[in-house]
From Swiss-Prot:
Organism: Homo sapiens (Human)
Protein's UniProt name: Large ribosomal subunit protein uL16m
Source organism, top-level taxon: Eukaryota
Primary gene name: MRPL16
Subcellular location: Mitochondrion
UniProt xrefs under Gene3D superfamilies: Ribosomal protein L10e/L16
Record InterPro entries: Ribosomal_uL16, Ribosomal_uL16_bact-type, Ribosomal_uL16_dom, Ribosomal_uL16_sf
């Protein structure tokens, strides 16, 4: 039997070497397989999919507010750590989430995930900040316009959506990156390990920095009178945040 198999596979193993034909040496390799992860401590909730988000808050009357762009400036102080899951979408900049963004995230993730082995939860509240707008061709004046829609402010460093379950990061990274690419601010898919590695790398860059002319030193010493063009936010955040934008390469 083995002789017949060798005759059948011999033409398939022949490759041209110079002007002659030769057989490739057949050898058996030893594979080192990684251990299969066990998800014994993972529990799937009763409703694993993302819930529907209301377009407007359910309150009797909403007061019109000024722009207040400080709600998307600087680093986030809430929803920066994992709670139940192991994977999430991390915001790398500030911005506003409209109701359409919530629907895009909900439909894409719910259609791509396996509800028997995965679950997803929101880490941002429903739209609550009113945005006013006047009609096209309307004359100036007449007070503030009527409320047009509602948004959710998001700061840099906040987790937008969190996922978990009996799965690995490679299984969810594809559609999480697809969702992150469509958000109105810079974002990326991360896991617990990658998020911790990002923070350690940033700390190591600051600790091993060889350039003595850092932003903090220049601003603190008021070199060339730079204080007159800096804001208090620049002194607090050491120049790493420029409005809603986050600059991780600045040390």
């Amino acid at each position: 039997m083995w002789r017949l198999l060798a005759r059948a596979s011999a033409p398939l193993l022949r490759v041209p070497l110079s002007d002659s034909w030769a057989l490739l040496p057949a050898s058996a390799g030893v594979k080192t397989l990684l251990p299969v992860p066990s998800f014994e401590d993972v529990s799937i909730p009763e409703k694993p999919k993302l819930r529907f988000i209301e377009r407007a808050p359910l309150v009797p009357k909403v007061r019109r507010e000024p722009k207040n762009l400080s709600d998307i400036r600087g680093p986030s102080t809430e929803a920066t750590e994992f709670t139940e899951g192991n994977f999430a979408i991390l915001a790398l900049g500030g911005g506003y989430l409209h109701w359409g963004h919530f629907e895009m995230m909900r439909l894409t993730i719910n259609r791509s995930m396996d509800p028997k082995n995965m679950f997803a939860i929101w880490r941002v509240p429903a739209p609550f900040k009113p945005i006013t707008r006047k009609s096209v061709g309307h004359r100036m004046g007449g007070g503030k316009g009527a409320i047009d829609h509602y948004v959710t402010p998001v700061k840099a460093g906040r987790l937008v959506v969190e996922m978990g379950g009996r799965c690995e990061f490679e299984e969810v990274q594809g559609f999480l990156d697809q969702v992150a690419h469509k958000l109105p601010f810079a974002a990326k898919a991360v896991s617990r390990g990658t998020l911790e590695k990002m923070r350690k790398d940033q700390e190591e860059r600051e600790r091993n920095n060889q350039n003595p002319w850092t932003f903090e030193r220049i601003a603190t010493a008021n070199m060339l009178g730079i204080r007159k063009v800096l804001s208090p936010y620049d002194l607090t955040h050491k120049g790493k945040y420029w409005g809603k934008f986050y600059m991780p390469k600045r040390v």
